């Protein structure tokens, strides 16, 4: 919702994208805006183009943003936390919409999210990042079945499991390092519980490279490889 300008109508904002990038006039831009709103599942798009952002729901606002992002038929759509602050039902609708649009338009989606459930549902391949670095990369099924990096294991271990009884959820101790002054070695070392005292000495001073431990499965950790 906050990405939309509160003082301009929805139609103006969608049409502006088309005017800037495709040099469409106002009339043609509004006509295309109606088509785009219809494509992303907004009811009565002919009326909604005249609405202001505060007159639509959070889910509809998210659909408007997706329409604006797809207006120029990009080859790649970068979706940064597209379901944040939406209730579970609306989240599912937005994810279904993105999946449907991907199949219809052929647009690739780079999905940025902290929600492992969304990743499991949407992704083909996953890149796990910690403190500004890639620590693991693998096909989604491989990552969930066989996580290798201690941080990835910690993320998956913190997810509640239906039917599993435990007093508290697993947590990763410590906090993220200062990115303005990162540690010289492995950035996860201060929080890592996987390395022993001997290995920790190396982890403190040497940042491990990203290595391919299995076909298509990359990890940044001294626990793996012949390093």
Predicted regions, residues:
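A short, proline-enriched helix->beta-strand linker immediately N-terminal to the Walker B motif
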Residues: 71-75
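ABC-type ATPase nucleotide-binding domain
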Residues: 3, 11, 16-21, 129, ...
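Short catalytic/signature loops enriched in Gly
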Residues: 43-46, 139-227
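Conserved ABC ATPase signature
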Residues: 51-56, 60
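Conserved Q-loop
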Residues: 3-12, 87, 121, 185
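P-loop NTP-binding/switch modules centered on Walker-like glycine-rich loops
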Residues: 78-82, 86-168
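Short coil-to-helix "N-cap" segments within the ABC nucleotide-binding domain's helical subdomain
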Residues: 8-38, 46-50, 139-150
């Amino acid at each position: 919702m906050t990405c939309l300008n509160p003082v301009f109508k929805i139609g103006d904002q969608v049409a502006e994208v088309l005017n800037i990038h495709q040099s469409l006039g106002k009339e043609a831009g509004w006509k295309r805006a109606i088509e785009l709103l219809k494509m992303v599942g907004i009811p009565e798009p002919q009326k909604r183009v005249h609405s202001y952002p505060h007159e639509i729901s959070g889910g509809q606002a998210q659909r408007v943003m997706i329409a604006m992002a797809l207006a120029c038929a990009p080859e790649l759509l970068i979706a940064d936390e597209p379901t944040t602050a939406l209730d579970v039902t609306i989240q599912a609708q937005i994810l279904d919409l993105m999946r449907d649009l991907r199949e219809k338009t052929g647009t690739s989606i780079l999905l940025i999210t902290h929600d492992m459930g969304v990743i499991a549902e949407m992704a083909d391949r996953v890149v796990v990042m910690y403190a500004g670095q890639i620590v693991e990369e693998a096909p989604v099924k491989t990552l969930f079945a066989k996580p290798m990096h201690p941080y990835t294991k910690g993320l998956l271990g913190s997810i509640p499991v239906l039917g599993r009884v435990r007093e508290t959820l697993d947590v990763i101790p410590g906090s993220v390092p200062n990115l303005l002054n990162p540690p010289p070695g492995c950035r996860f070392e201060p929080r890592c519980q996987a390395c022993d005292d001997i290995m920790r000495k190396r982890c403190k001073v040497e940042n491990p490279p990203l290595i391919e431990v299995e076909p298509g499965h990359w990890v940044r950790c001294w626990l793996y490889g012949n390093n």
